[in-house]
Amino acid sequence: MIYEWVPSGKPKEVRKISLQSSPGIMKLSPFPEKELGLQPGKEYFLQVVIHCDPDNPSGDLVDEASIEVVKMPASVQSKLNRAANSVEKANIYAEAGLWYNALDEALKLAQVSKLGEVGSTLLKDLAKWEAPKTIPELPPKQREAIEKRIENLKQIADSAR
């Protein structure tokens, strides 16, 4: 599910997507190419639910994240225009903190349902980038969620090559 944060109330549902799960890395494009997707300058809330047992919904795995969609900075676009391949593009995106774009480029280099070497490295880098956010000033629940996400990223990076 993708929701848009609405300042004056309840998050607005933007898209609900159902997928048939398969082993390994699954790539999802929530919007058709011709459809306008998430808008720069807006903040969204993503929720992924994996139904492990249809008869036991309390056992579902749930993860959530907030993302802010930003306009592509001109300096990043300029570097991308000069990039020779997907490895360079993935690194440019990662250096700019555009992790979804970076992973999208990395997956172009990997076998189907695999993360690949570049993708694995990116996830490890993302885990390092997330680590400073576990500072003691955060509420325990938020800090624990970030710590869990970091461990999950490391585990995926090591197992899905």
Predicted regions located by residue number:
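Hydrophobic beta-strand segments within extracellular beta-sandwich modules
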Residues: 45-46
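Well-ordered beta-strand positions in beta-sheet-rich domains
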Residues: 14-16, 25, 64-66
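Contiguous segments within soluble domain cores/interaction surfaces
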Residues: 1-19, 118-121
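Signal that preferentially marks extracellular ectodomain short beta-strand elements
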Residues: 23-40
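Extended, polar beta-sheet/loop recognition surfaces of beta-rich domains
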Residues: 40, 52-88, 92-94
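Alpha-helical protein-protein interaction scaffolds
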Residues: 81-161
